[in-house]
Amino acid sequence: MKQIVMQGPRKSRVVEVPMPEFTDDQLLVKVTYTGMCHSEWYPWSVAKEGEVFGHEAVGVVAEAGRNVQGFKPGDRVTGLGGGGYKEYIVMDPVKTCHVPDNLKDEDAIVEPLACLLSCAVKMMPATPGDPIAVVGCGYMGLGMISLFRLCGYGKIVAVDKRPEALENAKRFGATECCLPGEIPSEYILNWETMGKVDLTRDSNNEKLFAMGLPNVMEFTGTEDGLRLAGDLVSAHGRLGIGGYHNDSFRNLDYKLWNFKAFTSINCHERRVLYEAGLCQRCLDLLSSGLWKFTGVTDHIYSMEEFDKANEEMEAH
């Protein structure tokens, strides 16, 4: 079978490898699609020879181990697991779920969806009608906007430097869309905006708490995006960090963050079985039409185009 294997930084090739072996308690799955995750862009750019990537697979059960229950050959499945950039993978039934009949394969890649649902849980509780901003409107940001709409948030402010991303944000439920340089001043609480307000006469903090937004979610994965998200959070607000910051250290104004006394929430999830439990919920929400987040895929690449796909992701 074929597999994408790295040859070094930014360079891969498709090679022939043996079919994977699976036990009586595992599934052998023929992969139809594997989603590209921005968390793997930096590792791709500095990869060592022999490294493999891919953790967002969807496919069809080719064979089921004799002890496996609930799955059979021909079932469409998705779930959690690595090494997905190859024709066949081995999956653990505990971390695998069925794809509903009314969902396309490309809409049912569940790993990032489970990450989004975990983010929504960590940003709770939310009172219906609460405002929130989403900084970074790529795939994850758009999914978060649509999920926040389902959760009952009111004003949803989308922020991105790409006009086309803001158009997509409107499609998935954003009520306001802003380029970074065009954000209304009342949504920003930093040293500059505070310097324009006489806070010495603000003994009860009414002026201070009128600035910024109480809930902000960051999905840029960049230092500039994270700093901007921090500027948007109101005093005693909440900042959810969903962007994957794995390329270098971040230089942040923690003096400002400290003064604003907001809560910073790491929205990533490392409890594999907990995340696995969210997977079927995500697909059920999509299948029922409650979570309106389908038809997002805009590029499908061959295995031979893996490097091109990463280069295009880098450009955006």
Predicted regions and their residues:
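Glycine-rich beta-strand-centered segment in the early N-terminal region that forms part
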Residues: 18-35, 42-83, 100
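NAD(P)H dinucleotide-binding glycine-rich loop of Rossmann-like/cofactor-binding domains
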Residues: 33, 77-135
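C-terminal substrate-binding/catalytic core of Rossmann-like NAD(P)-dependent dehydrogenases/reductases
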Residues: 197-206, 248-298, 307-308
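Glycine-rich adenosine-cofactor-binding loop
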Residues: 129-149
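Residue-level marker of beta-strand positions
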Residues: 3, 56-58, 76, 88, ...
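ADP-ribose/adenylate-binding Rossmann-like module
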Residues: 231-249, 265
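Adenosine-nucleotide cofactor-binding segment
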Residues: 134, 149-226
